[in-house]
């Protein structure tokens, strides 16, 4: 099996397939993603989320903010299971979604845990991390504010944020409040979309 042109092991493929089946089951009763995207679950959500680990395939500690239906946090945790190292802390305040995330992690033997708390309170629970991820959560300025407890003054902590066609406007807005190093990774799944890799975050105002 390949995702975004990269080979995926049989074990990881089986975990992803089991996650997809669980997701479809739970999505009948919980609004995990926009219903219009369920028919394209593999490409729109699983392959898209896989890009984060494919960009940064290292066994680090992740904080996945506003995890929702598990994208990209559960997908990253599934890839880490193959490495048998690293961990994903999934932060989701909605208790029904948090229950789904716990079930998904347990049944796929993924390397992660769920914190059903507000993002603003999560740093005290999680501690330091090597990477932050978020998808469909907030604009870049908001994401940097959420990520600041982990990233400010931590040169080795990187943020990986999915963004759509308006990402340049979001970058311009964020530069009014923050300084940061930026790498733009073009999406292999969505035309005009990117994953923004942020490091060396500094607050201006």
Swiss-Prot record:
Its EC number is 2.1.1.170. One of its GO terms (molecular function) is rRNA (guanine-N7-)-methyltransferase activity. It is found in: Cytoplasm. S-adenosyl-L-methionine binds at residues 66, 71, 119-120, 135. The gene is rsmG. It comes from the Bacteria. Keywords: Cytoplasm, Methyltransferase, rRNA processing, S-adenosyl-L-methionine, Transferase. SUPFAM superfamilies: S-adenosyl-L-methionine-dependent methyltransferases (SSF53335). Belongs to the methyltransferase superfamily. RNA methyltransferase RsmG family. Coiled coil: none annotated. This is Ribosomal RNA small subunit methyltransferase G. GO terms for cellular component: cytosol. It catalyses: guanosine(527) in 16S rRNA + S-adenosyl-L-methionine = N(7)-methylguanosine(527) in 16S rRNA + S-adenosyl-L-homocysteine. It is an enzyme of class 2 (transferase). HAMAP family: 16SrRNA_methyltr_G (MF_00074). Specifically methylates the N7 position of guanine in position 527 of 16S rRNA. Pfam families: GidB.
């Amino acid at each position: 099996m390949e995702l975004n042109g990269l080979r995926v092991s049989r074990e990881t493929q089986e975990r992803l397939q089991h996650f997809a089946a669980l997701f479809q089951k739970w999505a009948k009763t919980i609004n995990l993603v926009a219903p219009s995207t369920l028919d394209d679950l593999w490409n729109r959500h699983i392959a898209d989320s896989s890009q984060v680990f494919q960009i940064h395939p290292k066994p680090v500690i992740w904080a996945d903010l506003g995890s929702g239906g598990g994208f990209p946090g559960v997908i990253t945790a599934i890839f880490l299971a193959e490495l048998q190292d690293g961990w994903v802390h999934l932060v989701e305040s909605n208790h029904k979604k948090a229950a789904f995330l716990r079930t998904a992690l347990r049944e796929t033997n993924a390397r992660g845990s769920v914190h059903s708390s507000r993002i603003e309170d999560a740093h005290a629970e999680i501690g330091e991390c090597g990477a932050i991820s978020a998808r469909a959560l907030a604009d870049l300025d908001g994401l940097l504010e959420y990520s600041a407890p982990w990233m400010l003054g931590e040169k080795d902590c990187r943020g990986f944020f999915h963004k759509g066609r308006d990402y340049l406007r979001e970058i311009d807005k964020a530069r009014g409040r923050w300084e940061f190093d930026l790498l733009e990774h073009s999406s292999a799944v969505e035309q005009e979309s990117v994953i923004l890799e942020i490091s060396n975050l500094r607050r201006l105002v």
